[in-house]
A protein has these predicted regions:
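Positively charged n-region of N-terminal signal peptides that target proteins for export
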Residues: 1-4
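Hydrophobic helical h-region of N-terminal Sec-dependent signal peptides
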Residues: 6-10
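Glycine-rich catalytic cores of cysteine/serine-nucleophile enzymes that process amide/ester linkages
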Residues: 21-26, 38-114
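A short, compositionally biased domain-edge/stem linker segment
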Residues: 27-34
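Generic ordered-secondary-structure signal
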Residues: 36, 76, 86, 133-141
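Active-site nucleophile-His-acid catalytic modules used for acyl/amide transfer and hydrolysis
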Residues: 101-146
């Protein structure tokens, strides 16, 4: 029984090691976001993709993308833990035409999509919430809030 336990732990541990390299993992668009060049309505979308490496067994990385009416780009908001280790804020904000990129090899799923006047009304509330996010400069995987 002891040998079986050691074998199972070894297999589990080795399978947790990935041959994927975050530097070469796909970050291309999944093709599920509306093109801001042709979609003029306001848009709010929330995406989730498996976290990188073994973390993907237990967690997803989520991010919010907002595009005000007639905007040429989306603003993406996400919390990224590795940024804190480099002296940067965990909260990341950037502009893009493709908010639906793979999360280091993991294809995102769109878990919320809202367009039109309702989205336009909520975007300022999201921007305000982001600007007041209390954990913008810190990150803890467990127990959260990130």
């Amino acid at each position: 029984m002891k040998t079986l336990c050691i074998l199972l732990v070894s297999v589990f541990s080795l399978s947790a090691c990935t041959t994927k390299d975050w530097r070469t993992a796909s970050r291309e668009s999944a093709g599920i976001a509306a093109d801001p060049a042709t979609e003029k309505q306001a848009i709010i979308e929330v995406y989730a993709a498996d976290a990188f490496s073994w973390r993907g067994w237990f967690a997803v990385h989520t991010w919010i993308a907002v595009k005000p009416e007639n905007a040429a780009t989306y603003t993406v908001y996400e919390v990224v833990g590795w940024r804190v280790k480099r002296g940067l804020p965990a909260l990341r904000e950037y502009q893009t035409t493709t908010p639906d990129t793979y999360w280091y090899g993991a294809r995102p799923e769109k878990i919320l999509s809202m367009k039109g006047p309702k989205a336009a009304k909520l975007i300022p509330d999201i921007q305000k919430a982001v600007s007041h996010y209390p954990w913008a400069n810190e990150y803890t995987l467990f127990p959260g809030p990130n």
